[in-house]
Amino acid sequence: DKAQTIVNGWKSRVQALRSRNAGKPVARVFYEVRYPNLLAAGRGGISSEILALAGGENVVSDGKKLVRYSEESLIAADPDAYIIQKGPMNPEPTPLAERDHYRDLRAQRAGRVLIVDEERFARPGPRALDAAEELENWLHR
């Protein structure tokens, strides 16, 4: 059956992601949903699942889907990588280098800042698996 073949293909890709990332260092990642009035992806949503599949760890420990996050907490977390979601929730994101308090973040200093499409990285569905594979390549390059 064609549907089962497609589902099996997705399962195989998920397993391949998990296998490739087993034993690799885990990057601590902040996922920005909106700025200003900083809103982060919490551990309860698809964005955090994509991060985990890609071999990253969300620095936001709250189990909600979306979390209001203070700049002080972000600076204290000092993530290895920073993802900025672009889309309806964050239509014209300000580059990290242009934000006074963000310039010294480890992610900014290391050039580990990625702007991603909200449609692919924040919506459940087959494209989320594509997003995880893309993010894995970026995190582990």
Question: Model regions: which residues?
Answer:
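N-terminal ligand-binding lobe of clamshell/alpha-beta domains
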Residues: 1-141
